[in-house]
Design a protein with these regions (language model features):
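Cell-envelope/ECM-targeting effectors and their regulatory/trafficking segments
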Residues: 1-125, 309
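Catalytic glycan-binding domains that act on GlcNAc-containing polysaccharides
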Residues: 86-89, 105-335
Length: 335
């Protein structure tokens, strides 16, 4: 990897004097180590500044621990006193940290594809052909459309598709990262080699994890101790409903688009309660700029519990209701 950003006295920053090639090399480095989600364009703007800030934060604070296990290395080990604050600008002290990270095989870099367009087309075809056994494929495809636009690789830069969450308000920290077509999420960074092999190198395994996650949410987060409050309010606490059709009906788990059409629709507006009687209301968030959703299929009229499971796939709270609305729209409208 070319590292033209390593130059005595050079500082790469917004409005700085770095050349487009120097900025591109820095962006490519940040992309490969999981701090930039895309945009290798030679322009040092807000996205690049946020990526630099996130790396600076980790050099100061990331000891490799995570609630889902430990990273193979502590990012702090590369600092060696060179980075003392989060500035959003890459000086030569930070550049030297990046060089050491890139040269250390223990810091796992993100995989890339020699043919991202072809590989994305291939995995889309495989997903579309999946049988609706453990989960309805129409719902799964609708989730993957929302998560990654049905892409495992970012076609603009060839690296595996990555989503960066920043949920530690007031800091530059990237709190979790979603990878690939299903945006399988981990909370430690960098990832371990086994994780790269499991759900980054192999798109099919990534999709399988999404299938398993959706089925787990259906089985354990709709009815019972960790129930879906919208389902309880609208349907009650009765048994889970896999499909409104019997298992021997040819429409079983496959006629979801027609069910979405038959369910009718409603407009969802900002300040609407999540459901009748709910204290929470639809509001814009850092992930969803608008809380206006016209013509969304009525979740309670599907005759199954997958509309509630897809919300729990995203967790709980206001973001999960945004997510649910978008997935239900996909179920009905995707070609």
């Amino acid at each position: 990897m070319t590292m033209s950003f390593v130059q005595p006295g050079l500082v790469l920053s917004q409005g700085g004097a770095a050349t487009p090639d120097q900025v591109k090399d820095l962006q490519r480095a940040l992309r490969s180590i999981g701090y930039l989600s895309g945009g290798i364009d030679g322009k040092f703007q807000g996205g690049s500044a946020k990526a630099v800030s996130a790396l600076q934060y980790d050099l100061l604070h990331n000891d490799g621990s995570g609630k889902d296990g430990n990273a193979p290395v502590a990012v702090t080990s590369y600092n060696k006193g060179r980075v003392t604050e989060v500035t959003g600008a890459c000086d030569q002290n930070l550049a030297q940290c990046i060089v050491e990270i890139l040269n250390d095989a223990a810091f796992v870099q993100l995989p890339s594809s020699a043919d991202p367009v072809g590989e994305n087309q291939s995995i889309r075809a495989k997903v579309a052909a999946l049988p609706s056994t453990s989960v309805p494929t129409r719902f799964l495809v609708s989730i993957l459309k929302q998560e990654s636009d049905l892409r495992h690789y970012n076609e603009a830069d060839s690296y595996v598709y990555i989503g960066l969450d920043r949920n530690n308000e007031g800091t530059a920290q990237v709190t979790s990262r979603g990878y690939g077509i299903g945006q399988f999420t981990i909370f430690h960074h960098p990832p371990r080699p086994d994780e790269v092999a499991d759900f980054m190198d192999d798109p099919a395994k990534n999709v399988s994890k999404a299938q398993n996650e959706l089925r787990d949410k259906f089985d354990h987060f709709v009815v019972g101790k960790s129930d879906a409050s919208d389902r309880t309010a609208e349907i009650g606490t009765g048994p889970l409903r896999l499909c409104k059709y019997a298992a021997d009906d040819p429409r079983y788990l496959v006629d979801c688009r027609q069910c979405a059409i038959d369910a009718g629709s409603r407009d969802i507006h900002q300040n609407d309660p999540f459901y009748a009687g709910a204290s929470g209301t639809m509001q814009p968030t850092q992930y969803y700029a608008s809380a206006e959703y016209p013509n969304i299929p009525k979740r309670e009229s599907f005759g199954c519990d997958w509309p509630y499971a897809i919300r729990r796939y995203n967790g709980s709270g206001v973001n999960s209701y945004h997510y649910q609305a978008r997935i239900l729209r996909n179920v009905r409208d995707l070609a």
